[in-house]
Amino acid sequence: MAVASSPEKDQPLLQLQKVDSSRVGGQVLSPTLSSSLETSQPICITSPYTDLGHDFPTIPFYSPTIFSYAGPSISDCTSVHQSLNPSLFWPSRGHMGSPIPLHHSQHGQPIQSPWVEISPLDNVLKTKQDGASLPLAVVPVRHKSARRRSQESEEAVVTSGGKTDLHYCAVCHDYASGYHYGVWSCEGCKAFFKRSIQRDNEYICPATNECTIDKNRRKSCQACRLRKCYEVGMTKCGMRKERGNYRSPQMRRMTRLTSQGRTDSSSVLTGSAVVSLNAPQPSALTSEQLIERLMEAEPPEIYLMKDMKKPLTEAKVMMSLTNLADKELVHMITWAKKIPGFVELGLLDQVHLLECCWLEVLMVGLMWRSVDHPGKLVFSPDLSLSREEGSCVQGFAEIFDMLLAATSRVRELKLQREEYVCLKAMILLNSNMCLSSSESSSKLLRLLDAVTDALVSAIGKTVLSFRQQYTRLAHLLMLLSHIRHVSNKGMDHLHCMKMKNMVPLYDLLLEMLDAHIMHSSRLPRRSPEQEPEDQADAPAPPHSSGSGPSYTWTPSSSEGAGEPQ
C-alpha cells in the first residue's frame, strides 16, 4: 500500500479536525450520515498523538481489516464501536525503527471495505433495522471529480441495462417507438400502415411478392411491406388478434373465431369450446324460429368502394375479387357463430368446418345476388361482371360459365330467401364429418337435422303438393353438389394464380387457401405393402412415372380426396 504523505497526489486528502480530549474521553463519536453524502471514499488520518514516541506519517485509512484487526465490520455491528485510537493498530513506545510497512498484496482478493461500499441510505436503513445507531468516527467526504465519475458510471449502467428492455419493429426490425395497431412497430411502419388502410391503397409488387423488408430496404416495395404488416399481426382496429407471428395459421384462425363477433359479455371460453350462455339450443327452437335466426345472422353487403375503370385487366379484376373475398371472410366468421348451436362444437371443429367450405359459401352468396341479373355475376353492389369482362382473367372463363349456369338454375327454381339461408347453413354444417370427437359429431348431426327440418318447413309453406315439395327438396339438395364442383374449380384456379404470383393474397384469404391444401394433404396414404395389390387390379395413373405413382392432392379433386397424379 502506498504511503499517502506526498502533497502531489491527484486526489487531495482531507484530514480530520482535532477534537478536544475532554470531549473524546469515554464518549463515542456517532455522527449521522447526511442524506446529501454518497458512498464513502478513502480519507486520511494524521497522527497528532506525540506522546507515543513514533513519528507516524499520514497514512490512508481504509478498514480495520487491513491492519489485521479482528473486530466486526460496520455491517455486522449491532453494538457501539470503540473510539478510533492509533494504539489499537500500532505497538507502544518500545517499538523501534521505521513505521510498520503495510502489505496489502498479501490478500488473495481485494478486501471490500464497508467504509467504501455502504451508502448513506443503506446505513440509515441498517440502523433502523438493527435498532442501534452505527457510530462513525470519521465522516467520509467525496471529491467533486469522483462524484462526477460515479454519476456517469451509474448513468451508463442504467443506459446499458435499459437496452435489454428495448423492443424492435416487427416489420423492419428497427427500434420500436411503441405498440401500434396490435404489434410493436417503429414510427415509419406505423405511419405507412395508417396511410395504407385509410386511403385503401392497393400496391403491386414489381417482382415476386417476396421482397426483403428490413431497416434499409423497407421503402423498396410498398406491396411487400404492407403484406408483412398483415403477416406480423397489424390490424385496422388496433387490437392484437394474435401474439406474434410464431403461432400456426390455424391458431390465428382460432383466435379470430373466438374474438370476432363477440359482443355479448356472457360469451365465455370454456375448455376448447365457445359457449354462449344466452344462445338457445337448436332443439329448443321451432323451424320458424330457426329460420328467423338464420336470416338475422346474414352478413351485410360488402362494397368494393372503388371505381373499376375500363378497359379491365387481369390484375385489376383479380385484385378486386380477392379484396372482396378477404372482406367477406371476416363477416363469414361472424355469420357462422350466429348459427344456433355452431359455437357448441369444439373450437378446432369450428375452424375446420369453415376451412372446408369457405369458397362454397362465397359462391352461393354470389349466385343469390346475381339471380335478378341474367348474364352477369354481381360480386358486390358496385361490381358486376359480364362473361366478356371476366374473360380477361386467364382460365376464368370456364368457372364464369359454371357460375352463370348454376345461377340460372337457381333462377329457374325461384329460390326463396328462407330456402337460401337454410342451404347456406347446410353447406357449412355438411362440409366435413371428420370431427375431433364423437360428441362433436353427434352435435353436428343434430344441428344438421334441425336445419334440414327448417328447409322442409320452408318448402311446405308453398302451394305445392306433397309430391312437388319432395321434388323441390331433391332439386335444391342436388344444387349443393354443383356448387361444390364449381368451388373445387375455383380453388384450383386461385391456387394457380397464387403460385404464379399473379395476384397478392393477404391475411385471411391466404390462410384459408393454404388451410384447404393443408387439410387435403393430411389424407391417409396407402402403405407400400398395399400398393402392389391395388395396382394389380386398377389401371395405372395416366401421369405415373417410372418410380411409381405419386399420390398428391389437387384442389380440383372432389370432396378434397387425394388422387393419383
UniProtKB/Swiss-Prot annotation:
Subcellular location: Nucleus
Region annotated Hinge, chain positions: 235-285
DNA-binding region(s), residue ranges: 169-234
CDD domains tied to this protein: NR_DBD_ER (cd07171), NR_LBD_ER (cd06949)
Zinc finger (NR C4-type) residue numbers: 169-189, 205-229
Domain NR LBD, first and last residues per copy: 286-516
Tissue-level expression: Abundant in the ovary and testes, barely detectable in the brain and muscle and undetectable in the liver.
Pfam family, one: Hormone_recep
Residues covered by region (Modulating): 1-168
Principal subcellular localization: nucleus
Keyword tags: DNA-binding, Lipid-binding, Metal-binding, Nucleus, Receptor, Steroid-binding, Transcription, Transcription regulation, Zinc, Zinc-finger
GO biological process, one term: estrogen receptor signaling pathway
Molecular function as annotated in GO: hormone binding; nuclear estrogen receptor activity; sequence-specific DNA binding; steroid binding; zinc ion binding
Protein's job: The steroid hormones and their receptors are involved in the regulation of eukaryotic gene expression and affect cellular proliferation and differentiation in target tissues.
Similarity field: Belongs to the nuclear hormone receptor family. NR3 subfamily.
Domain notes for this protein: Composed of three domains: a modulating N-terminal domain, a DNA-binding domain and a C-terminal ligand-binding domain.
Subunit structure: Homodimer.
Protein name (Swiss-Prot/TrEMBL): Estrogen receptor gamma
